[in-house]
């Protein structure tokens, strides 16, 4: 555990019934005259963009829509959108979407000038300076991008996803309106929900875990383990969906305070090269990596603590070993229940790509150094072999 730690978060978070209405007041309070609205075609097609659009209209401000962002975008695709954004003349940003949309908007908020671009931030994220206020509206209960200082982009030439991290990208305002996730397709709800699960359990068992991250990681883990199945299975389970939305936010706060570990590190090549959805790649690796990590005594102890906090039913586990094993089995059960693939074979990943995966995965030292149990290239090889 770190001896020094800090937590920075958005200026204000609005949740509950009709939370979207707060956008109107935010725009007026900031004196914004023109709003850049980031979204994507899928959000528009699902009818989800109408709510924030109406709230922006009610403010009387002009607005400009930027919706040409592909799924799992490369840094070049994000730069193209940022270049369009620069022509809008906007003085405030509103982003409505999943992690990719929110990350693109966060990057835009620090790229108003021509001093540097996304590629330069990949090499030197510290140069990013806050330029515009930003409002983030998540349409999934998973990524936590609405609260983190991170922006994840694909780097095709490295066949990797890379995180750009700078606290100047933390949102000013977050809107958690459960109406945005009510009709989320089960497949997407499942993948993003398990992404949030990975955030919480990785942050709780990482080297940088601290009282701030523990607070949010444990509460998020409790909410997810006891609500994710019903939230995904039942379109009308609004109480459970709302809890998942809050849990995803807590997971993002945990990332901000500590950070993810080997699950995310080893998943980045799966998205970067094979375009496997981020939540799915994390789900495939979640139980294998946590089982590997549980051989470290401190991780095993923390998994037992998580069991004591999150297991509300009359389970019979009494020892640390039993509790840690139960937690890992619970992770596997959730992934199975949600019908998420558990092997790379289902995505056509050939066995001969193994060494390339190992090489790429070991490059993500930003996250691997946070893993309590050190991960060697041989360890990574065995973990990838397990999911082949």
List where the protein language model places each region:
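An N-terminal, well-structured beta->alpha segment
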Residues: 1-66
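Gly/Pro-rich interdomain helix-loop hinge
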Residues: 273-353
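Glycine-rich phosphate/pyrophosphate-binding beta-alpha loops
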Residues: 142, 249-282, 365-367
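N-terminal small/polar loop signature for handling phosphorylated ligands or for N-terminal nucleophile
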Residues: 44-116, 230-241
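Carboxylate- and glycine-rich phosphate/diphosphate-binding segment that chelates Mg2+/Mn2+
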Residues: 150-258, 372
């Amino acid at each position: 555990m770190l001896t020094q730690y800090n937590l920075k978060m958005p200026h204000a978070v609005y949740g509950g019934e009709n939370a979207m209405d707060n956008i109107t007041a935010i725009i007026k309070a900031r004196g914004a005259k023109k709003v850049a609205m980031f979204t994507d075609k899928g959000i528009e097609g699902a009818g989800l963009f109408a709510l924030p659009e109406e709230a922006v209209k009610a403010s009387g401000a002009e607005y400009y829509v930027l919706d040409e962002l592909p799924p799992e975008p490369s840094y070049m695709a994000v730069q193209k959108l940022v270049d369009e954004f620069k022509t809008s003349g906007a003085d405030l940003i509103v982003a409505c979407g999943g992690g990719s949309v929110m990350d693109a908007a966060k990057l835009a908020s620090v790229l108003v000038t021509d001093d540097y671009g996304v590629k330069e931030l990949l090499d030197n994220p510290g140069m990013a300076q806050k330029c515009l206020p930003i409002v983030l509206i998540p349409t999934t209960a998973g990524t936590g991008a609405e609260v983190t200082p991170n922006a994840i982009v694909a780097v095709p030439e490295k066949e990797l996803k890379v995180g750009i991290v700078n606290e100047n990208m933390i949102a000013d305002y977050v809107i958690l309106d459960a109406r945005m996730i009510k009709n989320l397709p089960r497949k997407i709800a499942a993948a993003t929900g398990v992404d949030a699960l990975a955030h919480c359990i990785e942050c709780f068992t990482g080297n940088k875990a601290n009282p701030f991250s523990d607070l949010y990681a444990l509460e998020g883990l409790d909410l997810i383990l006891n609500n994710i199945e019903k939230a995904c299975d039942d379109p009308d389970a609004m109480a459970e969906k709302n809890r998942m939305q809050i849990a995803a936010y807590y997971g993002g706060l945990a990332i901000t305070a500590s950070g993810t570990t080997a699950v995310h590190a080893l998943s980045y090549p799966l998205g970067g090269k094979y375009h496997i959805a981020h939540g799915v790649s994390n789900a495939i690796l979640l139980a294998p990596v946590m089982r590997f990590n549980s051989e470290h005594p401190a991780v095993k102890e923390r998994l037992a603590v998580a069991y004591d906090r999150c297991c509300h039913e009359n389970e019979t586990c009494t020892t640390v070993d039993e509790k840690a094993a139960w937690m890992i089995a619970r992770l596997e059960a959730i992934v199975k229940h949600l019908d998420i693939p558990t092997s790379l074979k289902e995505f056509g990943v050939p066995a001969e790509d193994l060494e390339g995966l190992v090489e790429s995965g070991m490059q993500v030292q930003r996250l691997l150094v946070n893993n309590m149990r050190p991960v060697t290239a041989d360890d990574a090889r065995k973990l990838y072999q397990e999911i082949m």
